[in-house]
Amino acid sequence: FGCRMVVGLGAYPAPVPHTRDVLLSVTTSSAKLSDDLHGYVRGTLDVPGGIQTVIDVDANRAGLPALGLWAQVPHYVSTMPYPAASLALLDGLADVAGIDAHRGQLAADAAATRIRIDELVAENPQHQAMVTQLEEFVDQGLADGPVDAPTIDFERIPSGDELAAELQEFLRQRPDED
């Protein structure tokens, strides 16, 4: 088939705001390919195994470059369509594979979705505060400049247990409502 590279595309919920560009993470079992890629989030992230990992490892063993591009979707919108992630993935695919990826209606859909999310967030002060905190978190990580994406310190992200404890404390402090 003349295949010269295998690229898997996916997305995952992340502690990022919808008000910033979608960050892409890259996964690969090839050290050389990892060293050659610039502009992607670097770091170690433990995730459940999946078919993409098997394809990546086997393709690299066969001498075929393989990687996965993963869009970081704001966790608070991860259950709804998020065209900005699809757009970022297409742009990332075009970048790593050296192809022209047709974007179609995605840019307009992403803009319309952004407006709708802005409206929803504006209706709730707690949501506004959360988005502001996420903006600060992401902006601190990106402060080193646009030359290459930063290494995000995943140790600074609260664990599931810490988030659950914080949520329980928040709920305890709320006045009882009938």
Q: Where are the predicted features?
A:
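Acidic-aromatic/histidine active-site loop/patch
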Residues: 10
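Accessory terminal and edge-of-domain segments that mediate assembly/interaction
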Residues: 1-5, 13-178
